[in-house]
Every structure is written in structure tokens, then in C-alpha cells.
Amino acid sequence: MMAGMKIQLVCMILLAFSSWSLCSDSEEEMKALEADLLTNMHTSKISKASVSSWKMTLLNVCSFVNNLNSQAEETGEFREEELITRRKFPTALDGFSLEAMLTIYQLQKICHSRAFQQWELIQEDVLDAGNDKNEKEEVIKRKIPYILKRQLYENKPRRPYILKRGSYYY
């Protein structure tokens, strides 16, 4: 009886080690994919003048994936446990749905990575800065008082003769 338990224990240990090695390979692939994506983003971040189409596509894909998650959570008819089990185990397990689920999971991991979120904030700042400049120009084009126009522009240092003028009156 002891020999049978030892064989089962050895089989369990071998199974655990093999599954850990498979998981580490997929994690390494995900880290390599994420690193490649982030290096491409970092090198392209240097030219902030225009946002390339693949970056905007990636932002759109991430927002789409987040919308899918939020729609599934907004149904509210199911408890969270049922929703999680439905998400993990679809009704028809064919090769296409498994591959699609894996792709969506990888996209979620990339979109939720901290470095990508920081890059996304930088890109939003660049886009918002472009919009702010256009809004300032529109405000300036309207007829507004001179003082308000002066406040919109960056403050210039005061001229020295204005500061020295007070000493002449003493």
C-alpha cells in the first residue's frame, strides 16, 4: 500500500513540474510580447507630433476589450461566481473559440499592464494638448477684452524700466 502511494506522489510531482514549466513558457512568451510591444511604443514616443495608426488601433482595441468586460459585468442577472465560470468555460469548446479566448486574454493582459497604461496616459496628454491649443486659438479669435487676451498668453517678465520708475519719484 505504501508503494502505491509513493508512485501516486511521484506522478503528482511530475505532473506539477510539467505544468509549471508549461506555464512559465507561456508567461515568458507573454513577457516577450509585452516587452516587444512596449519597446516599439517607447521608440515611437520620441516623435510626439503625430500619433501613428497602429497606436490608435491598439488604443481602440483596448477600449473594445474593456467594453466587452463591462457589458458582461453590467448584465447583473447572474451572480459573480456564475459569470466567472461562464467566462472561463464556454458552452462549445472548439479550436476557434479557445484561440479567440486566449487572444482576448492576452489583449487584456497587455491593456492592463502598468507600462501600457502609462503610455496610454502620455498619448492622451499629447492628444489633449493638441485640442487645448485649438481651443485657445478659438477663444483668442473671439472679441474679448485686452486683459483677458494677455492672461491667455504665457506670462512675460516685466520690463526693467517699469520696476525702476518708482525710484525716480523719491
UniProtKB/Swiss-Prot annotation:
Keywords: Cleavage on pair of basic residues, Cytoplasmic vesicle, Secreted, Signal, Vasoactive. It is found in: Secreted; Cytoplasmic vesicle, Secretory vesicle. Residues 1-23 form the signal peptide. One of its GO terms (molecular function) is neuropeptide hormone activity. One of its GO terms (biological process) is positive regulation of gene expression. InterPro entries: NeurotensiN. The record marks P160, Y161, I162 as: Cleavage. GO terms for cellular component: axon terminus; extracellular region; transport vesicle. PANTHER family: NEUROTENSIN/NEUROMEDIN N, NEUROTENSIN_NEUROMEDIN N. Belongs to the neurotensin family. Interacts with NTSR1. Interacts with SORT1. Interacts with SORL1. Neurotensin may play an endocrine or paracrine role in the regulation of fat metabolism. It causes contraction of smooth muscle. This is Neurotensin/neuromedin N. It comes from Canis lupus familiaris (Dog).
